[in-house]
């Protein structure tokens, strides 16, 4: 779908559906939305200073989309297996907010690593990420509006922060030698945060408090997220932030397109194993995936991906965020 298609759809919907109430799950194709699409199309993320990062392992194996019943979670993709565990009194992170938090954490960790390399900060400071004195400003950095009440954003974000910081993640890579039957397994486990200090006001999120809020990542988790991170366009994330599936698809497609050399069909079973959490069957997953893909392609018209009966047909195209050749820790 091109920018012109989006504008045409917007014009048609304005004429035909003036009185239709659009839910949060549907993109409201208004003038402001189209302006954002045009800005993404005309100016790169680098030029707009809107580059963020996500750890590669979080693309290969994703978080739950909705609240899981258990406090353990596993995802498998090829020879990589991710296992997550959280205290029963807290629970596992899930949904949109957890994903946006992980992008923010990955981005800040990469920036701190760059500062360390330049001698701006020390080894003792590199894993400490400052969240700021104002909850509203932190939420704006995530692309969220600060709102209270039963259906507001403040309480669920705080809950996802608590869940994420207390979670332990293990990554296992398995290699099998088919000739002699040898199996080699490499595994690393890490709690996300060693220490956190959150001091915000739920009643007055806009206030600057005396104490700075911060989180200190564990050494092993810090190393996991700075290892070959994938660059993202934060403007795209903000457009699709309400859909966990769309966020997963965008991050995955950005990485996949970066090395795709020929037309490929990815089976639905493989996609479901990687990111199809909490779905009853392949049919349900396909429907949700296609909805998410449509949201992504509105923001990224150059993504040449088409759902078929067998799987997703994806063709080589320009990465949404171009490769950077110089700094390996700041690109693919």
Segment roles from a protein language model:
Residues 1-332:
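Charged, alpha-helix-forming regions
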